[in-house]
Amino acid sequence: MTVTWGKKAHDDLDGIAKYLAELSPQAAEKTVTRIQKAVLLLREFPNMGTKVDETGLHRLVVSDTPYVIFYRVFPDHVNIRAIFHTSQRRFLE
């Protein structure tokens, strides 16, 4: 199964990387790598996250990070919608 990234998710990952790099380049690299590895797992196990609603939205907590990936599962691909820090109270449109 293929994985596609929505613009928001791509922007979220870029923002996370930039923010963390200001604090610690090593932490930024480690966190971004963990997020990317979690996304790669979705190719093989698209339903590994928790289903959030009836529209097919899922969430996956990224191990050893405070980040959550929101994504939708389609018959032929997984679409990454957003990446949030667990302290954020944001909603997807």
Per-segment meaning from a language model:
Residues 2-57:
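Basic, Lys/Arg-enriched alpha-helical interface segments
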Residues 29, 62, 67-68, 72-93:
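Enriched for short, Lys/Arg-rich terminal
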